[in-house]
């Protein structure tokens, strides 16, 4: 079985994708879309997502933050995003 290409997404990557008014939103969204279409697997951590959600709460609407959370969780359940749990 062929291994999927993986890229680690940090806070700023997720923020650029989720924050539509951000300077890099279009560029980050295009990269993410092309990466997914090519069969790539985004990898991130629970700590990264916590930081991203905290920043989104201060920069976007509650609905925008909720949409991001729901999207990430759905992608994780569908094996389209891998979330690593950080332990010490």
For each feature predicted by the language model, list its residue ranges.
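Short linear capping/connector segments at secondary-structure termini
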Residues: 49-50, 72-73
């Amino acid at each position: 079985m062929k291994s999927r290409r993986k890229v680690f997404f940090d806070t700023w990557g997720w923020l650029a994708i989720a924050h539509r008014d951000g300077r890099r939103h279009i560029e980050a969204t295009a990269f993410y879309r092309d990466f997914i279409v090519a069969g790539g697997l985004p990898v991130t951590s629970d700590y990264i997502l916590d930081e991203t959600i905290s920043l989104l709460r201060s920069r976007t609407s509650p609905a925008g933050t909720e949409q991001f959370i729901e999207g990430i969780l759905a992608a994780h359940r569908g094996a389209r995003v891998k979330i690593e749990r950080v332990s010490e």
